[in-house]
């Protein structure tokens, strides 16, 4: 078949989440090499390496003809590539191959959860343009959260149960995570202010978090808006119901315990200072400034049949 691209670069981490990364690389290169005249396979040994490679690609120091990027890994690895591409203004399409515990954004792109199947989908995938979240000086595709979602991420890092990864059980599981940290917040969304006490705040770009779909029909990473959710202390009992529902439901029918505010620019301060989860990576603390950057990134997308 005719090669679509001149030179593709496939990034991966040794600890990508696949049991055998070398076998995984072999399984995906068959399809990728069929759409690229030249395919480079680039190991990222340390955190931050992918961002450095993006800088080299922009300066034409890596190679002069790179015209597509691929990433094999989980949400954290994907997040590093997104930061590299945005920081160095690389106007190149990206193909995401799932290789970690969760790949929430690949669901949005209709990409198969299996890396080999995903690589085969790249052959016919089309380039779509998507919004990106900017958080202070970092970037993310999917979400920004604090409160309970950070406690969950820290539990996962400790090898404990991922409650957000099994949202169908969250109603009962969250009771084992008793007394989640309450915090005071001051929130500004498009110049409107909100304040109060909560246990979790979430700003979403994509419709999937923790493998489950947020039940809002109009939530899209291509609409130039973010969706912020403020959870009150009573809302845990209804989280289970929310994430079991179909995505066609009306948000207002399910709860008054979760406030939903769409917007483009967000400023958030808390008391006490809170850690912030960005696409599964805990790398910032409040206060934070968040904004949506419309049509910022090109991602290979599988047509929804």
From Swiss-Prot:
This is Putative lipid kinase SAR0780. ATP binds at residues 44, 74-80, 101. It comes from the Bacteria. May catalyze the ATP-dependent phosphorylation of lipids other than diacylglycerol (DAG). In fact, is not able to exhibit diacylglycerol kinase activity in vitro. PROSITE patterns: DAGK (PS50146). Mg(2+) binds at residues 220, 223, 225. GO terms for cellular component: plasma membrane. Its cofactor is Mg(2+). It is an enzyme of class 2 (transferase). SMART domains: DAGKc.
